[in-house]
Design a protein with these regions (language model features):
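Structural and coupling elements of P-loop NTPases
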Residues: 1-689
Length: 689
């Protein structure tokens, strides 16, 4: 593959619902352009894009994969992203380096939650977009219904550029609306006249295209309303402007597994999607945070951003990056700006699925990989020492589903920690929480399948088998009453004895941490033993008398006591304090506190009633509702954290994958009696075991 400049490169991110055939479209493009000698299929384990063992086993994309094709003197980097919601972190990495989007839609299934999510992304990022209606040859497929579904959901910028030719239930060719010519699959090189049955619809769609073209330029608008036709140059100009601005979003159709519609799709990408050079200027920051404008050409100083990291057991760390400005050369010394460390680019590659092809240079706008960088992670910027710049980080989704994990064999603890650290480097949507209170390692992922893949990979790649359970809820205990209790520790065993004696007043307070005071009069307890009393009480407060949870909101006052001139020691007063705690706290009206979380849920408006009703069942309180746009609602609520353990999975089920949420711990509140009784009973049973 030859070198390509920014004016010849197009970076296309593929998005859409899981199962719509995104990977198959790329496989078809690779095969059609002779980049591969056979049409790869995930189901057969021959896919270039879905090459991981987990992807082959599950029959779906899990990881973002890159594949370049050469087409009519341009290079198209296809960035294939997973459509399944559990792998949104991987998808965001790919979306970050895409300059235009290809949204793939199944001709039988129409608009699904993954399609809607893709639409939100392209509108937020202002990406030029083409829709490809795939699987047009399957039983019960309908171009007309799918197109209308797209139009109903996403508006009049969605315009067909092609319609299929049907003979009975069979697709035999397609009509190019722009050229008003028909191509049949049995003779793909010779254009034919449009079948009479399609003439009216072709003219209707052409009128939609012409009107959209007219809206892109004042001269074209004047010509359109004068009733004049556009020439080829005017059509090309209007389409380029319209597609680039998002005013025109062409719809094409075909069958990736039959390799139909692929040639015209490649032509459309080449002709109407902007090159990377057309960005002109992009914004970065210098190390002090001041804005810096960088030119997207080869003459600008080099800069690149790492968007994905792969830890290969044989090669080591592979950093996938996009050259944002300038030229990247093998053996060059570059600066990791965030870490302020120099890195040597030992070898540069372009990637095609899991395959790496060595190159000497990579130019502005292109995507490639570098191996064995010592200090560089995902989101780091590489640049020159003379012109160090930093680009905005990719915003990865926050994982919300947690499971407690531990290795089946204790000997594997270090191996598990090492493996999880490597996996977090690869996937920023994984989060680990080593909870010192519950002594659990909690693994957070995007969903059940995401966590399942992580555990499967731990076993297959790192040889660590994992046990799991639901994470423990961090309850608290406090008191509502006031009581004074005595603690006396006396030990005599022939030698030096131990003696400590104290009276402790326990009462509620507003402080989360225990407040310790003393009101001892007349030296009943010498000052030197006050710290020992406090230390003994603080140790006890780690384990409440109801269910063994940490105690908060208690003021403990040392009021009186006695000592022995010979036998009193710090350890004795520490023990006496513990005895006072055990005697007094059960009488101070102890209660259980449960953690309350503040939740924000984003859902399509039609699910509002369902979500509110569900929160009521979870003992939640609705704080507010805001209409984010005409179709989306944000609901804010307070809900006990114990009721939200599996909410990531349950929300997806309630909204058909269209909802998302975040939750943050807010405060502790007294648990209702039935809840408290259940928690206390389970804690006592656990202690008995």
């Amino acid at each position: 593959m030859r070198d390509y400049l920014a004016s010849e490169v197009r970076n296309i991110v593929l998005m859409g619902h899981s199962g719509s055939g995104k990977s198959s479209v790329v496989e078809a493009a690779l095969y059609f352009t002779k980049a591969t000698d056979r049409l790869g299929k995930t189901s057969e384990g021959t896919s270039v894009m879905d090459n991981d063992a987990e992807e082959i086993r599950r029959g779906l994309s899990i990881y973002t994969s890159i594949a370049p094709v050469e087409w009519k003197e341009c290079k198209i980097n296809f960035i294939d992203t997973p459509g399944y919601l559990d792998y949104e972190g991987e998808a965001q990495a790919g979306i970050a380096v895409g300059d235009s989007a290809l949204i793939v839609v199944g001709a039988k299934d129409g608009v699904e939650s993954g399609t809607e999510k893709a639409w939100k992304t392209i509108t937020r990022r202002h990406l030029p977009t083409i829709f490809f209606i795939n699987k047009i040859d399957e039983e019960h497929a309908s171009f007309d219904k799918t197109y209308q579904d797209l139009r109903d959901h996403f508006g009049k910028t969605v315009i067909p550029f092609e319609v299929p030719i049907m003979e009975g239930d069979k697709v035999v060719g397609s009509v190019n609306i722009l050229r008003r010519k028909a191509w049949y699959y049995d003779d793909r090189t010779t254009p034919k006249e449009v079948p009479p049955a399609l003439s009216d619809i072709v003219e209707e769609y052409y009128s939609q295209i012409a009107e959209a073209i007219a809206m892109t330029d004042d001269d074209l608008m004047e010509k359109f309303f004068s009733g004049e036709s556009f020439d080829e140059n005017e059509v090309a100009k209007g389409l380029r402007i319209g597609v680039r601005n998002g005013d025109i979003r062409p719809v094409y159709c075909g069958s990736a597994v039959q390799c139909t519609g692929i040639e015209r799709l490649l032509d459309l990408i080449r002709e109407y999607f902007p090159t990377y050079a057309e960005k002109g200027l992009i914004e970065a920051q210098d190390p002090q945070g001041n804005p810096v404008m960088m030119e997207t050409n080869e003459q600008e100083a080099f800069s690149a951003q790492v968007f994905k990291t792969i830890v290969d057991p044989f090669v080591g760390k592979i950093s996938l990056l996009k050259v944002l400005t300038g030229v990247m050369s093998t053996d060059a010394q570059v600066l990791n700006v965030q870490k302020d460390k120099m890195e040597k680019l030992n070898q540069i590659y372009i990637v095609k699925g899991k395959h790496q092809i060595a190159v000497g240079k990579l130019f502005t706008g292109d995507i490639g990989a570098v191996v064995k960088l010592q200090s560089t992670d995902t989101n780091d910027t590489l640049a020159t020492r003379a012109k160090p710049v930093v680009y905005p980080p990719i915003e990865f989704p926050r994982p919300m589903l947690g499971v407690a994990i531990w290795p089946k064999t204790k000997a594997d603890e270090d191996k598990m920690s090492f493996a999880l650290q490597r996996m977090c480097e690869e996937d920023p949507s994984i989060r680990l929480d080593k909870n010192t209170e519950t002594h659990e390692t909690v693994l957070y992922g995007m969903g059940v399948q995401h966590i399942d893949v992580i555990l499967s990979k731990l076993k297959s790649k790192y040889k660590v088998e994992i046990e799991t359970s639901e994470p423990k809820v961090q309850y608290r205990e406090t008191i509502r009453g006031t009581v004074t209790a005595e603690g006396k520790h006396k030990k005599q065993s022939g030698g030096a004895g131990q003696y400590g004696h104290c009276f402790i007043k326990f009462e509620p307070c507003d402080s989360e941490d225990m407040v310790f005071e003393e009101t001892v009069f007349g030296g009943a307890v010498p000052k030197q033993y006050f710290p020992a009393v406090e230390a003994g009480l603080r140790e006890c407060m780690e384990k409440g008398v109801l269910a063994g949870y940490k105690v908060v909101g208690v003021k403990a006052t040392l009021t009186d006591g006695s000592y022995h001139e010979v036998d009193s020691k710090e350890i004795a007063f520490k023990a006496a304090a513990r005895l006072a705690y055990k005697a007094g706290m059960p009488k101070a009206k102890p209660i259980l506190l449960e953690p309350i979380g503040k939740v924000e849920v984003l859902i399509p408006e039609e699910y509002t009633g369902t979500i509110i009703g569900d929160f009521n069942k979870r003992r939640g309180i609705i704080l507010g509702m805001d209409l984010v746009d005409e179709k989306e609602q944000k609901i804010t609520a307070e809900v006990p954290m114990a009721e939200m353990q599996k909410y990531a999975t349950e929300l997806r089920s309630m909204t058909q994958g269209r909802g998302s949420f975040v939750i943050e711990f807010d405060r502790y509140e007294p648990a209702p009696q039935p809840v408290a009784e259940k928690v206390i009973r389970e804690a006592n049973l656990s202690d008995d075991d």
